[in-house]
């Protein structure tokens, strides 16, 4: 059987890729929206990484950075942006929390989310709203309207952040993100996206969508492992604050002989990471 690759309102059939996965002939798996099977190549990479840790004398300084930079580059090509805008994160919640920490709000403003939206893109906003004394506006699909129309209709001058997915996980409904971005621009609202249910399956062009922040967990359509994901931050947020004051995101952290002397602020975005990077 083949797979469908969706490129904005049309599907392109591609040849069977069963040989790339560890899927027996008597199994037809159709629930990648829940969790994807790992590619054989990904399973091999995980195994190779585990074996490397079992022989730590083989680990070089380059291992801390080179594969991360390669992953950032490849993901940037998928969504049509620059690698300097991408960080590696452990979860969607981590990325959304980073966005919430770096976006400005104002008095009497509101954050717009969807009814039944996945909670990773809800709980951080509830906390922000409580701390800042602002409102959460939950949008459901209006009668005789698409979900896109319902979102756009609900964005007003008081809207400061629109935090939505591309695909609603409970129904599979698709949101036209460029249309939402246009409305956000009219009221000067920030756009934050959870693309876990769509990135890798739907063509996603950040040059067109222009999100402020976007987050993807890799265990669905990205065909990757748990506890890995990507965070996109638009250039205007590159001087923002990370959730953790890790040494590896400091300037000149590649020089392991001076890790106790890293007094500069976070590394240049183009060097490796922007706001966060999981490390001990």
Region spans (language model):
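Pyridoxal 5′-phosphate
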Residues: 11-280
């Amino acid at each position: 059987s083949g797979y469908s690759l969706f490129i904005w309102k049309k599907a392109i059939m591609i040849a069977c890729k069963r040989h790339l996965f560890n899927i027996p002939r008597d199994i037809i798996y159709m629930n990648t929206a829940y969790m994807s099977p790992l590619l054989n190549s990904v399973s091999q990479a995980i195994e190779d990484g585990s074996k490397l840790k079992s022989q730590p004398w083989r680990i070089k300084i380059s291992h801390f950075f080179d594969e991360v930079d390669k992953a950032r580059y490849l993901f940037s090509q998928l969504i049509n942006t620059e690698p300097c805008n991408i960080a590696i994160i452990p979860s969607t919640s981590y990325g959304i929390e980073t966005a919430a920490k770096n976006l400005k709000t104002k008095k009497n403003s509101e954050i717009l989310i969807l009814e039944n939206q996945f909670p990773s893109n809800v709980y951080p906003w509830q906390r922000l709203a409580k701390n800042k004394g602002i409102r959460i506006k939950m949008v459901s699909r209006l009668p005789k309207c698409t979900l896109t129309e319902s979102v756009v209709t609900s964005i007003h001058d008081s809207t400061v952040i629109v935090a939505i997915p591309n695909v609603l996980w409970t129904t599979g409904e698709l949101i036209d993100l460029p249309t939402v971005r246009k409305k956000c621009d009219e009221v000067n609202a920030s756009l934050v996206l959870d693309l876990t249910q769509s990135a890798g399956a739907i063509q996603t062009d950040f040059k067109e969508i222009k999100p402020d922040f976007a987050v993807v967990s890799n265990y669905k359509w990205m065909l990757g492992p748990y506890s890995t994901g990507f965070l996109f931050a638009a250039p205007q947020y590159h001087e923002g604050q990370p959730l953790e004051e890790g040494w590896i995101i400091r300037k000149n952290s590649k020089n392991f002989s001076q890790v106790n002397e890293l007094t500069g602020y976070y590394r240049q975005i183009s060097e490796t990471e922007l706001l966060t990077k999981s490390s001990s």
